[in-house]
């Protein structure tokens, strides 16, 4: 593990599980320990970009605390916009009913149906009039969909990314969302790229991560 500050890595991973293991390894070995604004101690690596070539096989890492039932419910809420557990917000609500006005996923589908080479098929979660005044704000900020080489590819930006606890669920849900959009547009789902501005592991997950990354290159 290093204490010096380092910023920026690009990783090409085969699957979601591969992406998780390699991301954890980078944060564990090259991240810097800081105390965040809530007083939590984290090990953080900034600007971590991971390209997942096949996010549809080996979606659930063996070591994650998320089981398939919970992951399916997470994906369902992401795609449908439902909030059955009365959270302050869900990503699905922000994507399907942004500020009570816009279904951004419908917009993405229509945009790509009308113009397959569009660079405007984007959905955002941040609502400035709301999120500048509350404590609970989205970590996932932007989903960008592009059709290239006969497939829809998704690039997702996270301002803050809990790699130890949330990455497997985030990517499981995003892979299901990409499959949904691809089906509606009538093309094949492609790669998923995550850009994590603050990729971090909370101190309560350090021991777990230590065991997971043994043997990871």
UniProtKB/Swiss-Prot annotation:
Entry-linked Pfam families: Thymidylat_synt
What EC number(s) does the entry state?
Answer: 2.1.1.-
| Gene Ontology BP, a term | dTMP biosynthetic process
Predominant location category? cytoplasm
Answer yes or no on keyword Methyltransferase. Answer: yes
Q: Which GO terms describe its cellular component?
A: cytosol
Q: What is this enzyme's class at the first EC digit? A: transferase
GO MF term list: thymidylate synthase activity
Q: How does it assemble?
A: Monomer.
List the protein's name.
Putative thymidylate synthase
Q: What organism is recorded for this protein? A: Methanosarcina barkeri (strain Fusaro / DSM 804)
